[in-house]
Amino acid sequence: MDPTIAAGALIGGGLIMAGGAIGAGIGDGIAGNALIAGIARQPEAQGRLFTPFFITVGLVEAAYFINLAFMALFVFATPVA
């Protein structure tokens, strides 16, 4: 394999993982902030707030794992020159 293609694949894969990790961290932080603010405002609504929070965090983490799959595609399925 051409070293330029391999280097580009590894750099692209690293950028994909970095963007996914940063995005997932920001998304989880925003969701957690909203949960804490909602519980602080209405403590009796804590039970109703946890379900949408966990669904949101699950969707954010699913997007991260989709990024992981694309990274694996770019790094391990690069064309052979």
Curated annotation (Swiss-Prot):
Keywords: ATP synthesis, Cell membrane, CF(0), Hydrogen ion transport, Ion transport, Lipid-binding, Membrane, Transmembrane, Transmembrane helix, Transport
Membrane topology: Multi-pass membrane protein
Its biological purpose: F(1)F(0) ATP synthase produces ATP from ADP in the presence of a proton or sodium gradient. F-type ATPases consist of two structural domains, F(1) containing the extramembraneous catalytic core and F(0) containing the membrane proton channel, linked together by a central stalk and a peripheral stalk. During catalysis, ATP synthesis in the catalytic domain of F(1) is coupled via a rotary mechanism of the central stalk subunits to proton translocation. Key component of the F(0) channel; it plays a direct role in translocation across the membrane. A homomeric c-ring of between 10-14 subunits forms the central stalk rotor element with the F(1) delta and epsilon subunits.
Site description Reversibly protonated during proton transport, residues in chain: E61
Family: Belongs to the ATPase C chain family.
Subunit structure: F-type ATPases have 2 components, F(1) - the catalytic core - and F(0) - the membrane proton channel. F(1) has five subunits: alpha(3), beta(3), gamma(1), delta(1), epsilon(1). F(0) has three main subunits: a(1), b(2) and c(10-14). The alpha and beta chains form an alternating ring which encloses part of the gamma chain. F(1) is attached to F(0) by a central stalk formed by the gamma and epsilon chains, while a peripheral stalk is formed by the delta and b chains.
GO CC terms, sorted: plasma membrane; proton-transporting ATP synthase complex; proton-transporting two-sector ATPase complex, proton-transporting domain
Compartment(s): Cell membrane
Pfam families from the UniProt entry: ATP-synt_C
Transmembrane segments: 5-25, 57-77
GO molecular function: lipid binding; proton-transporting ATP synthase activity, rotational mechanism
NCBIfam families reported for this sequence: ATP_synt_c, PRK05880.1
Keyword Aminoacyl-tRNA synthetase: no
Protein name, entry field: ATP synthase subunit c
InterPro entries per the UniProt record, alphabetical: ATP_synth_csu_bac/chlpt, ATP_synth_F0_csu, ATP_synth_F0_csu_DDCD_BS, ATP_synth_F0_csu_sf, ATPase_proteolipid_c-like_dom, F/V-ATP_Csub_sf
SUPFAM superfamilies documented for this protein: F1F0 ATP synthase subunit C
